[in-house]
């Protein structure tokens, strides 16, 4: 395999790892699929069993061999980290993989990069340089690059990755985000109390600005996620017990699949939460950022899927205000006004309604509103 050159931004990484012999062996595994493709019908968990059988470990494998090295401690749960990518952000992807492999964690880490709509071979070349074991801790860490075998888009890519894992835990990381030091250790400790699902605070990066987003709690409940989207409960913070949850691939354009997953998790059992920033989330660069119409469809999908969202006045007003804003951004003034009225009826003090009306009347562009909010680490 031809290994892509590492840009200057990663020269320090390469230098720190090149002191040891390169032991990566890149192999192509051609496994036979053991079942038919998973269908899109049924609940995510019902589809999950079929999905796991339908997505064999095909793809490119980077195994970190280490003769004579001790295996990671069996007392620590193994973690499968699913990183979806479209393959056209190599520097950010390398940084994401590096940050995962650089965790000080005594258990096995298995990274599954799922390529959605691009060449797995090219993506494998992009990450080859950052996968060099440094010590015994890295001995059994592995990285695989697989094609998305399910529905195109983010939910299908995530489920492809989940199905490819045999680990105790599943974790997500977007290809433009980075785990910060101590994430895995802190979250696995939080899960040790009996929780099935854990999250943590984030550090939002927008341009040159970074702002922490904390929740001020150690537990996230269903009521919390009904009342507020809780932006800090971000997909790149998710870690949960394998076999408990799958992503719903019916989400329109993948919109709100992460909120839906967290809400379903919280309905099962409260979410363990570490209230310090352990993931750096970059806003404004995601390939999966949706268009306004997709955002509208995603919110309407959530209201239909989780009727309780319309019961809590604060939570309902927030969603209605978002729908008013998104319609205003599309120039649908009548629809924006209708949703603004519903917002005021649910909770008169909800700020999104007047903002949406300002956009609908042309007082301020929607893009400028988002830029101002993102600059402060907030979204609409």
PLM region spans:
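Glycine-rich, basic loop-to-helix element that forms the pyrophosphate-binding segment
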Residues: 147-165
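Short aromatic/hydrophobic "clamp" motif used to bind/position activated sugar donors
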Residues: 170
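Flexible acidic/His/Gly-enriched loops in nucleotide-sugar-dependent glycosyltransferase catalytic domains
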Residues: 137-142, 184-245, 292
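Catalytic core of nucleotide-sugar-dependent glycosyltransferases
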Residues: 277, 281-284, 289-315, 333-345
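Membrane-interface aromatic/basic loop that binds lipid-linked glycans or pyrophosphate carriers
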Residues: 14, 53-57, 62, 67-69, ...
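Short, acidic, metal-binding catalytic loop of nucleotide-sugar glycosyltransferases
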Residues: 98-108
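Conserved nucleotide-sugar donor-binding catalytic segment
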Residues: 217-295
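A conserved acidic beta->alpha catalytic loop
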Residues: 115-129, 150, 174
């Amino acid at each position: 395999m031809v290994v892509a050159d590492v840009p200057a931004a990663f020269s320090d990484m390469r230098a720190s790892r090149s002191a040891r012999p390169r032991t990566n062996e890149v192999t192509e595994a051609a496994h036979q699929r053991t079942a038919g493709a998973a269908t899109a019908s049924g609940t995510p968990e019902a589809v999950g069993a079929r999905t796991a059988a339908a997505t064999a470990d095909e793809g490119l494998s980077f195994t970190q061999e280490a003769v004579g090295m001790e295996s990671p401690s069996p007392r620590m749960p193994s973690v499968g980290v699913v990183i979806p990518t479209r393959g056209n952000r190599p520097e950010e992807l390398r940084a994401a993989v590096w940050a995962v492999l650089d965790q000080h964690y005594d258990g096995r880490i298995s990274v599954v990069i799922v390529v959605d709509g691009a060449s797995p071979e090219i993506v494998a070349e992009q990450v080859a340089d950052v996968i060099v074991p440094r010590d015994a801790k890295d001995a059994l860490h592995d990285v695989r690059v697989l094609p998305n075998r399910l529905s195109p888009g983010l939910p299908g890519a995530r489920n492809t990755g989940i199905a490819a894992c045999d680990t105790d835990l599943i974790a997500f990381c977007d290809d433009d985000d980075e785990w910060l030091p101590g994430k895995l250790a802190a979250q696995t400790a939080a899960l040790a109390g009996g929780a099935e699902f854990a999250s943590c605070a984030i550090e939002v990066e927008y341009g040159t600005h970074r702002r922490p987003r904390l929740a001020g709690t150690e537990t996230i409940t269903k009521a919390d996620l009904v009342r507020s989207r809780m932006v800090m409960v971000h997909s790149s913070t998710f870690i949960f017990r394998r076999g408990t949850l799958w992503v719903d691939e019916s989400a329109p354009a993948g919109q709100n699949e992460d909120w839906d997953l967290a809400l379903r998790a919280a309905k099962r059992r409260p979410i363990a939460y570490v209230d310090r920033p352990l993931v750096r989330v970059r806003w404004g660069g995601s390939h999966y950022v949706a268009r306004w119409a997709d955002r509208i469809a995603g919110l309407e999908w959530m209201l239909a899927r989780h009727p309780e969202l319309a019961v809590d006045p604060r939570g309902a007003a927030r969603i209605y205000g978002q729908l008013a804003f998104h319609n205003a951004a599309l120039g649908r003034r009548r629809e924006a006004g209708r949703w603004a009225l519903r917002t005021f009826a649910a909770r008169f003090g909800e700020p999104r309604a007047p903002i949406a009306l300002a956009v609908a009347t042309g007082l301020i562009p929607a893009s400028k509103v988002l830029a101002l909010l993102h600059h402060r680490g907030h979204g609409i």
